[in-house]
């Protein structure tokens, strides 16, 4: 493993770059949404940061006449701290910018720059430094550069799939940030030569700081958002459950990105969105409609209303996000064991195309 520690570092740096890019949309989405404009801002800023990192990383590499690998170790150590600051920067800057600036594009660009600019810049610097460290023979510069670039790209491909399919829906953004920071910390230790007792003490202190910053970010988030009682990352979106009180009532809401999807009156248990009761008109126009289909469940406020009002009718709900169903059970009182309710966890369009219960 020691023989390939530079290659491992380059691969993982490429992977972490894409992990950060993917979680950037999850961090920004509750404040500015996740539209094409927001993704454009995120990708543009991160590519800008990376291009600066490649350039300055090359300059640092050329100044490293002795090919001291400790320089790369120090870079990774700094990157670990910069990455661990992401949860704090989300609350301090992104939340503040979203409150006081109306232009979503400006908020997205500034937020991506402040929160992800430095980690992206530092991670990009890894490749040119690694190229210099591997180049003991001028005749092999091309092959070495190609190998390092290939490893970084393969790492980015791996990071894209691993983050999108596994990390985000199962761990959540804050845990992923902590994991990325600790991984960078481990790589920093792995690369450093001539480790002393003093060095190990310093690295232990850094680990404590990394963990503390992560928890501090979570604490500040709760202080600044006391209404949010649940913050969940699913395969499809970031979901907030909040409790909001007015002079008359207390409501529990479900928010996806910047949009309010569902809410209930906590005192009565009734759905808060009165317009949903217009769905009951189906019974006025067709008294024989006993098997109903609803595309999209969210917090299942209407299906629960339906089941209570029409005890002899059945409803099928197609909800693509299984986390929505879980949250509705935990926070909104959905009873998935009701024999008159059937839930399909799939895309609504696919369901309509392929189900055999469709009636025309």
Briefly describe each language-model feature range.
Residues 1-231, 243-249, 258-261, 273, ...:
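Alpha-helical transmembrane segments of multi-pass membrane proteins
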Residues 274-281, 347, 351:
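Well-ordered alpha-helical segments embedded in enzymatic catalytic cores
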Residues 235-240:
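A short loop-to-beta-strand scaffold at the N-terminal edge of the catalytic core in hydrolase folds
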Residues 325-327:
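Short alpha-helix immediately C-terminal to the canonical SAM-binding loop
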Residues 264-276:
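Conserved SAM-binding loop and adjacent beta-strand
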Residues 336-337:
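Conserved segment of the thioredoxin-like fold in thiol-based oxidoreductases
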């Amino acid at each position: 493993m020691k023989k390939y520690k530079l290659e491992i570092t380059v691969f993982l740096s490429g992977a972490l770059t894409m992990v950060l890019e993917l979680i950037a949309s999850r961090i920004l989405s509750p404040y500015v949404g996740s539209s094409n404009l927001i993704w454009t801002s995120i990708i543009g800023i991160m590519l800008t940061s990376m291009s600066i990192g490649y350039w300055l990383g090359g300059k640092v590499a050329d100044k490293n006449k002795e090919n001291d690998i400790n320089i790369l170790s120090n870079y990774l150590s700094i990157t670990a701290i910069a990455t661990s600051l992401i949860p704090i920067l989300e609350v301090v800057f992104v939340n503040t910018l979203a409150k006081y600036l109306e232009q979503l594009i400006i908020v997205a660009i500034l937020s991506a720059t402040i929160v992800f600019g430095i980690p992206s810049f530092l991670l990009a610097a890894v490749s040119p430094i690694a190229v210099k460290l591997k180049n003991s023979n001028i005749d092999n510069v091309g092959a070495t550069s190609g190998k390092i670039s290939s490893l970084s790209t393969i790492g980015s491909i791996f990071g894209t799939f691993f983050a999108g399919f596994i990390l985000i829906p199962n761990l959540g953004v804050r845990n992923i940030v902590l994991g990325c920071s600790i991984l960078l910390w481990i790589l920093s230790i792995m690369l450093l030569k001539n480790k002393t007792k003093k060095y190990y003490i310093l690295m232990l202190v850094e680990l404590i700081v990394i963990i503390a910053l992560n928890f501090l970010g979570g604490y500040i988030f709760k202080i600044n958002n006391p209404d949010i009682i649940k913050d969940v990352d699913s395969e499809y979106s970031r979901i907030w459950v909040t409790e909001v009180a007015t002079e008359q009532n207390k409501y529990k809401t479900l928010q996806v990105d910047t949009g309010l999807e569902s809410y209930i009156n906590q005192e009565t248990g009734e759905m808060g969105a009165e317009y949903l009761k217009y769905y009951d008109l189906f019974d006025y126009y067709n008294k024989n409609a006993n098997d109903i289909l609803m595309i999209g469940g969210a917090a299942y406020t209407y299906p629960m209303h339906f089941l209570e009002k029409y005890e002899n009718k059945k409803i099928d709900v197609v909800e693509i996000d299984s986390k929505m169903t879980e949250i509705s059970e935990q926070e909104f009182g959905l009873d998935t064991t009701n024999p008159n309710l059937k839930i399909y966890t799939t895309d609504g369009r696919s369901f309509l195309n392929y189900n055999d219960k469709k009636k025309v």
